Design a protein with these regions (language model features):
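Export/targeting segments at the very N-terminus of extracytoplasmic proteins
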Residues: 2-37, 85, 89-108
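Long, amphipathic alpha-helical surface segments
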Residues: 3-17, 30, 41, 68, ...
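Second-shell loop/turn segments in exported
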Residues: 16-22, 72-86, 102-107, 135-140, ...
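Short, functionally critical alpha-helical segments immediately adjacent to catalytic or ligand/cofactor-binding
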Residues: 29-41, 114-122
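Residue-level detector of buried hydrophobic side-chain packing
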Residues: 35, 61, 117-118, 149, ...
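Surface-exposed patches in mature extracellular/periplasmic domains of secreted proteins
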Residues: 43-48, 100-114, 152, 186-191
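Substrate-binding/active-site groove segments that recognize
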Residues: 49-76, 92-96
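Alpha-helical segment that forms one wall of the substrate-binding/catalytic cleft
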Residues: 73-105, 110-131, 146
Length: 197
């Protein structure tokens, strides 16, 4: 799931997400809309994401799902928008519960901050945070420092081992939501591996 160029439609402009402020709306509905837009909206038919290097990613459907009911999406997979929205809500709830259970500080974050972290985990998987090798991100979230969290999230912009502009754009948009600012002009600060997180 990336925000790189979708083969079947044009790429979204990052400033389109400026209007989202999860504090002003119901958390679940706004988080669903935020993620849906980052994923290119609802897609009834399976599609493949075109990576920056021209290769095609996995088959995807709905709101950026590569798996439905534990099975990989194929060109024959079907889904309704109602089904897709329910899967998206279930996934958001699962991610939210995971962070509440494993990172107590998460419960003290603002709705915008939670929405940004959920979007990140929806895109990368919660395992990116949990594996021991990713100590910078894990410690940043466990510590609750906003700058360390967004900088650590910003390290995850590769697809297939190569930098992906769509993922860089997505991390930028998530960072701006986390900081409750617009999506323009934010640049990640690189974190050295030996930084004491």
């Amino acid at each position: 799931m990336t925000t790189s160029q979708i083969v079947t439609s044009s790429e979204k402009n990052p400033t389109e997400y400026d209007r989202y402020n999860i504090d002003d709306y119901g958390w679940m509905d706004t988080t669903k809309q935020f993620i849906s837009n980052l994923e290119g909206g609802f897609r009834e038919k399976p599609y493949r994401v075109k990576n920056d290097d021209g290769t095609l990613g996995n088959w995807t459907i709905g709101h950026g799902f590569e798996y439905i009911n534990g099975q990989p999406v194929t060109p024959q997979t079907t889904i309704t928008e109602e089904q897709s929205l329910q899967i998206l809500e279930d996934k958001i709830t699962e991610i939210d519960s995971h962070f509440l259970e494993n990172y107590p500080i998460y419960g003290d974050l603002s709705p915008n901050q939670k929405g940004a972290i959920v979007s990140f985990a929806f895109n990368t998987g919660t395992n990116v945070v949990d594996v021991p090798e990713n100590r910078i991100l894990r410690k940043a979230i466990a510590g609750g420092d906003p700058n360390k969290i967004i900088n650590a999230m910003g390290l995850y912009f590769n697809s297939g081992g190569k930098p992906n502009q769509g993922l860089k754009n997505r991390r930028n948009i998530e960072a701006q939501l986390f900081l409750n600012n617009n999506a323009n002009g934010f640049t990640y600060q690189q974190i050295p591996e030996d930084d004491n997180y």
